Design a protein with these regions (language model features):
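A structure-centric signal for secondary-structure junctions around beta-strands
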Residues: 25, 41, 55, 74-76
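Enriched for short, Lys/Arg-rich terminal
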Residues: 2, 7, 11-15, 22, ...
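N-terminal first-folded block
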Residues: 9-42
């Protein structure tokens, strides 16, 4: 599965320390390789609000979340936001 980052997610990533950015990048790569398995776990959940239709949340660490969506035509994981749990939604 290909990975694309939105401009907002790139800006979000820059706010993290270098070790955190490495962790986040590794977890996003893991997500792209194991999406179907993670979808059946509690680590990946679909967001339910109308504003977030067809978007998912992935838990990276205790307080770090990634919001993303799957684009059907190319099976691409588009990372929309990366941030702390309290401020990402």
């Amino acid at each position: 599965m290909n990975i694309k980052y939105s401009e907002k997610s790139i800006k979000d990533l820059k706010s993290f320390s270098h070790p955190d950015r490495i962790l986040i990048a590794k977890k996003i790569e893991y997500l792209s390789e194991n999406f179907e398995i993670l979808k059946s776990s509690k680590k990946v959940t679909e967001l339910k609000d109308c504003e977030f239709k067809n978007q998912f949340r992935f838990i990276i660490a205790k307080k770090i979340r990634v919001l993303f969506k799957i684009e059907n035509s190319e099976i691409t994981l588009l990372v929309l936001r990366v941030g702390l749990r309290k401020s990402i939604y």
